[in-house]
Regions:
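Conserved AdoMet/S-adenosylmethionine-binding subsite of the radical SAM
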Residues: 40-178
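Canonical Radical SAM [4Fe-4S] cluster-binding loop centered on the CxxxCxxC motif
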Residues: 1-37
């Protein structure tokens, strides 16, 4: 799980990162450095010199990956390079809070990465409260964008849904998910 920004401008209600404010976008080399640093730490803990211990990467740490799109894509190409870390594109996931513009760009990128959507609510009223970006890209825009991504890439999309007691975990919420 790697970060794409220092801080985050989205301000999701359930995420501590938004409380720290947004400072800057990370460069591609800083994202790659997180993967290399994690591999070094894993080697140390396993007392191993073996490379390739990191096999999957998820852009889901601090920040909204789609708001640093160009650097994220550059880092993916570097991570995927056989002369570099050589992580298969299908082992890379980009998680977004629903930036439709970024999803549409990614759909045309010809990458085999997995798209993950931080959904957390099935109606705009609650989603506006939990994920302020929903005010810019409501579900009526997000869902067609996801469908177009699937159509163009033939890739699956995963949905993330944090259960918040008394907020989005009712039977009605569950029924809206299906």
């Amino acid at each position: 799980c790697i970060s794409t920004q220092v801080g985050c401008p989205i301000g999701c209600a359930f995420c501590a990162t938004g409380n720290s404010g947004f400072q800057r976008n990370l460069e591609a080399y800083e994202m790659i450095g997180q993967v290399l640093g994690s591999e070094r730490e894993l080697q140390r803990r396993l007392k191993s010199n073996e490379n390739g211990l990191i096999t999957n990467v998820v852009y889901m740490g601090m920040g909204e990956p789609m708001l640093n799109y160009d650097q994220v894509i550059q880092s993916i190409y570097t991570l995927n390079d056989p002369k570099g870390i050589n992580i298969g594109q299908r082992h890379i996931t980009i998680s977004t809070s629903g930036d439709v513009k970024g999803i549409n760009r990614l759909a045309r990128e010809n990458l085999q990465v997995t798209l993950a959507i931080s959904l957390h609510a099935c109606n705009n009223e609650l989603r506006n409260t939990l994920i302020p970006l929903n005010r810019k890209y409501p579900l009526e825009e997000l869902i067609p964008s996801i469908q177009e991504y699937i159509r163009l890439t033939n890739r699956r999309v995963t949905f993330e849904y944090l259960l918040l007691d008394g907020i989005n975990n009712s039977r009605e919420d569950a029924n809206m998910l299906i």
